Amino acid sequence: AASDVYKRQATHGEPSENNAHPHASDDGNVVAVHNGIIENYQELKDKLVRKGYTFYSETDTEVAVKLIDYYYKKYEGTPVDAINHALVRIRGSYALAIMFRDYPEEIYVARKDSPMILGVANGESYIGSDVPAILKYTRDVYYIGNQEMARVRKGEITFYNLDGEEIEKELKTVEWDAEAAEKSGYEHFMIKEIHEQPKAVLDTLNSVIKDGMIDLSEVGLSEEEIKEISRIYIVACGSAYHVGVAAQYVMEDLARIPVRVELASEFRYRNPILDPKGLVVIISQSGETADSLAALRESKKQGVKTLGIVNVIGSSIAREADNVYYTLAGPEIAVATTKAYSTQLIAAYTLAIQFAKIRGQITEEQYAGYIEELQSIPEKIQRIIEDKERLQWFASKQVNAKDIFFIGRGIDYAISLEGSLKMKEISYIHSEAYAAGELKHGTISLIEEGTLVIGVLTQPELYEKTLSNMVECKSRGAYLMGLTTFGHYNIEENADFSVYIPKTDPHFATSLAVIPLQLLGYYVSVAKGLDVDKPRNLAKSVTVE
């Protein structure tokens, strides 16, 4: 059997039955699935409409299928001839798997700038986008080159170039070294850890949600203590600080407790005035971050209650804090955090929801609704990760960027901060995050022809405001990328490139919107040939001051 391990996220047209793969020609003679983006699909579609083809979906894939069908019928040649004729006319990226009714025992594949791997074992053939997809079936693989195609039969694969000439390929055996085995076949720890986020988030949720209710008994905060909290101080460094910025909006809005977020390296040196009934929340993946640990000790010295949100069990912050919320991200190896960050967000959300309920700020119905929405986050993150080829394509165009600006308001500003850090720390491209309303106070003078500006628009009431800021940037020559939720398609009137995430409660948007920005930073770094997992001059756990 030939097996195609396949899942795809919507790129052209939103997710729907009509837009779902596989796509077929009008008479069902040709069917295909496709990863990638066909840049000139509208032009090809118009040509096919003139030739009498009708279209039932909004996808670029349907265009590819019907183009292949057109040349198959026009020249009455082989599938290889038809695919060749079609592919030389397609601009963009693709990994295609195609079947013809006349050749039921064969699958034809082709790739350009989108990942694909072929495997064989025991008279069977496998098609996948990367090694981990087929590893449980076989270790014997062919690496199909860029702008090459292949005919896949049971246990037999023949390769061709785009002129239709047969080419030889060497069968390779995948042999992981110890480190690669830890990476489970992924090229870098960072992309592995991005893929582990749905599980890490789910594990963290399951650790505190019991029978549809949030249970903080293992964290250690009692209901009486929660009712007495007068204000919250969130203290952290780096990405954990960005979690704090997002948490501030969520906690203040839901629990109606004043929140201050501060960098640990600033907090510890300013002789802070802390409310005796306050709660100091220290966020740290390693639990050893020097400045955060010093901030914790300063808070305890003043007699203020402390809560550590940490990933490493038994770490210094975990041992010394009065209460500990463990994020269950598992070991994180890449210097640039992804899954630890995502689990820290979940910790902040669950604290905010529980505080809001105990303090009578939300109804039982709202409480249940928020918990239900949180439980849908892992699956929504998974859907975004499956759309990674589209971001890979966009990232490849940004390798020569000199400056990138991320803009947003409210929670979208918190998302921008993390997106900007991911970009600069691993791709070494100068990037800044700005509250969108601050652009007019000087920043906009930095926008030049071609400067990439990424607008984050997940908050419905702030959408129009941020969009108008993006338009201001465009009028000064900026190249715009918009990051928003499905449904806001009018962004395409102004943005040069748009990324859509599933809808969620706006309080929790950071968990979804950060994923495309992690992928963007990762793929720009890969395209530049950099050491993604160990960026220059950075360490995983910052134990120095």
Stretches with model-predicted labels:
Residues K227-G369, E373-S376, V456-P502, L520, ...:
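Glycine-rich phosphate-binding loops that contact phosphosugars or nucleotide phosphates
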Residues Q9-H12, G28, I37-E39, R101-P104, ...:
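Short, glycine-/Ser/Thr-/acidic-enriched flexible segments
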Residues N35-E39, V109-L118, Y186-M190, V201, ...:
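Conserved phosphate/anionic-ligand binding catalytic regions in large, soluble enzymes, centered on
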